[in-house]
Every structure is written in C-alpha cells, then in structure tokens.
Amino acid sequence: MSSQTLAAKADFAFVRLKPEVAGVAVGEAALDDVFVDDIIVPAADRYPLGATLFLPRTGRRSHAVLINSGTAVPRKLYRGFAGYLAHRGCAVLTYDYRGTGDSRLKAVTGYNQPRSLVGFKASMADWAAKDVTSAVQWMRERYGNMPLTYVGHSFGGQVLGLLPNNKEVSRALFIAAQAGYWKLMASPERYRVYAMLNFVGAPLTKTFGYMPGWAGLGMDLPKDAFLQWVSWVMKERYLFSDSTLHTRENFHNFKGPLRAICLTDDPWATRPAVELLCSGFTATKPEIVSISPDDAGVKKIGHMGFFRPEHRDTLWRGAAEWLQAEQ
C-alpha cells in the first residue's frame, strides 16, 4: 500500500473524538445551528424535484455540496451527513430523482397520496440528463463564488460521468459507488441480486407498469428506470456496455480530484466494481480508499451504513476535510 493511500485512509479512520457540537444531527434530530429548508428544484424540463437545502446559520459559507442519492434511496438518508457539512460551513443540497420520494407527483384526489407510476416515463438516463444535470446547474448558479463539490452514493457516483456539465464540479467524493455488474458483487449476494432482478423484479415491473417497492427495494421505481438498471447489471461493463447511452462520452470530461470510498464489507460495491467505475474517468486519477468496519470502530458499514450518524466523528469528518480541501 502506497504512502499516499495510507495517508488518505488515515483521514477517515481515527479514534473516536468528542463530538464537535451537540447540535450536529443525530438521526432526525434538529440541527440547532443549521438552517434546513424543503424546496423545489426545477429539472431541465421544469419537472419539480423535491429537495432540501442545508445552510449554516452563522459564519461564512465556504463550499457548495451536492449530495446525489443511490437507486431507490430517499434523500432523507443523507440528512444527518448534510447537516454535518452545513455545520462546517457548506451550503448543501439533497434531492430525489423524478418518480421517487418527494419528486413523485401527487394524486389529484386522495389525502396527498402519491400518483401512480403506471405510464410514468423516466429512465436512469433521464435522471442523469434532466435531474442531476439541473441540480448541478442550480447549485452553480447560486453558489458560483465557491467550489462546487459532489458526493455520489452508489448510482449517485455513477451518474457523474454521464453529466454534460460535470466540468462544473470542483471535486467528487464517491461513497460505495460502483459499476454494478452482478458478477462483481460478493457471493452469495450476487446470486440473490441476479434472481431478484430477473425472476422477481423484471416480471413484476412489466406486469404492474412500475417496480413496486414492497418487492424488495423499499421504494417504488419507474418502469424504465428499473429495467434500464437491470440491463446494466447484466452487462460485463455495466453502463459502459450500453451502446445506446451516448452520454458515456462525458466520463472523459471530468478532470477534478476524485476519491472513491470502498467499504470492505459492502457486497455490492466491491473493490473490483469500484475500480471498474473509476476506470471510466480517464481525464483524472481517481484515488480509491478501502475502509473496513474496524477502521471506523464499528462492526458493520455495508452499502448504506456510511451515512449513519455514528460515523460523524470518524468517517464524516474525514470526508468533510477532503471535500473542503479546495479553497
């Protein structure tokens, strides 16, 4: 292991320290020193995206941070981490992709119930071209006097390479972001995923007209988004193998520093899967940092656990220091 990698790992793995302030979010607890506002961010086609803006109540704002969700992950998962970054002086935006979370249109009648996704048109390529691209633009227009940094969790990291405006991003931090080819997943999880997607998810999606969350993902997904994801998971080079995805060329345009965090107990974003995704960013030299639960002083992290508030004095602090390194 190189001295550079050791140094990077040390940024994220150190003994637990006394919390910096009691007001930092714990779960859904209030952030005493952070202004939190639920807003609407218009996508490229004016579709309303449910979003939350986190701002420090006092002090100078030093950086803008855009947090991009994993597939079928509501933005509220990132609330604690977003609040922590805002406490440190960042303007932070979280949001839901169209057809998910608070970016799902409401039914015309019926106690604020979400509208059916049957017939709703949205693919993962649409999320990239219309939603994420617009979120980057929205942050750049409002915070143009400060570095715009990018946090991508799982799909949220993958999509950076598809953005036509990824040059606007100063630096990017990937958390459990990978090329999701099923054979690169750890065993036996790879077989469970293969069976679930092909023998449960795809048939249900074609039958119902959308992927019902109760079938295993926890959140309903638009039909086209789910089926496009399944097609990528079955390809050896994941989205890089999709000849219809012309925005793959945008991977070569991102030139900022890129650090990819690989959690060693994550069965989805294994080291080979993270390396495959990072290989697409040819105009920069991605730095891959492997972190084990022992490094963070916990028993388990996995694919989703980085964003648990228990990591605010270890993993979160290292992430924040790296994101804010550029002045």
PLM regions with names:
Residues 6-56:
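N-terminal cap/lid segment of alpha/beta-hydrolase-fold proteins
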Residues 254, 260-262:
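Short beta-strand/loop motif that positions the catalytic acidic residue
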Residues 269-280:
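Short alpha-helix in the alpha/beta-hydrolase fold that links the catalytic acid
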Residues 287, 291-327:
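Catalytic active-site module of serine/aspartate enzymes centered on a nucleophile-bearing elbow/loop
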